[in-house]
């Protein structure tokens, strides 16, 4: 993923998740949405891209449940909590509630409606799988640069990984990244 947000745009991690209702809140059941396939993730991202029309957002495919959304916004001052920290927790307490996040919450609510009605979730239900019923937006922060690997060690280098985080670190240090077809970063690869 080689995304360079423009002026006035911010990138956010956009993870597909499975929420479960409780008596007074929605609970983060699975922050990976059952490790859905990259193909299914792309299908759902396309639905979000075509149906969320009242907000200036662009969705970018990553790996499985972990994707990226770029939106027009000033940087957020408050940290958005990663979904893996919320498993088993009610999400209401982690939803940003300041006026600064109004559009972000609106996007998440729209996504829930779109995903609820998507044919992919009907198929998942027939197969006995949990639905992909929400997105979780997080990972806001500032872009950074690292000291150049080449300047530091008088060598060039490449990183072979499926991890988007490690690819980002490598690029920030001026290193090449190598993608391996079929690699997901999960234990099966």
Can you describe what each PLM-predicted range is?
Residues 1-189:
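…; additionally, a secondary subgroup of soluble metalloenzymes is captured
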């Amino acid at each position: 993923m080689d995304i360079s947000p423009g002026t006035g745009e911010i990138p956010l991690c956009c993870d597909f998740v499975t929420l479960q209702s409780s008596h007074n809140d929605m609970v983060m059941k699975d922050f990976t949405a059952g490790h859905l396939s990259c193909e299914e993730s792309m299908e759902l991202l396309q639905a979000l891209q075509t149906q969320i029309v009242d907000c200036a957002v662009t969705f970018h495919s990553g790996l499985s449940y972990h994707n990226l959304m770029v939106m027009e916004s000033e940087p957020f001052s408050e940290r958005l909590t990663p979904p893996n920290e919320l498993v088993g927790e009610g999400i209401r307490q982690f939803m940003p509630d300041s006026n600064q996040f109004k559009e972000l919450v609106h996007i998440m609510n729209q996504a829930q409606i779109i995903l609820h009605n998507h044919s992919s979730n009907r198929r998942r239900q027939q197969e006995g799988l949990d639905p992909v019923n929400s997105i979780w937006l997080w990972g806001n922060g500032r872009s950074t640069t690292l000291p150049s690997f080449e300047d530091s060690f008088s060598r060039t280098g490449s990183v072979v990984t499926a991890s988007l985080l490690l690819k980002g670190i490598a690029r920030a240090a001026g290193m090449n990244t190598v993608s391996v077809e079929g690699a997901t970063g999960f234990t099966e690869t």
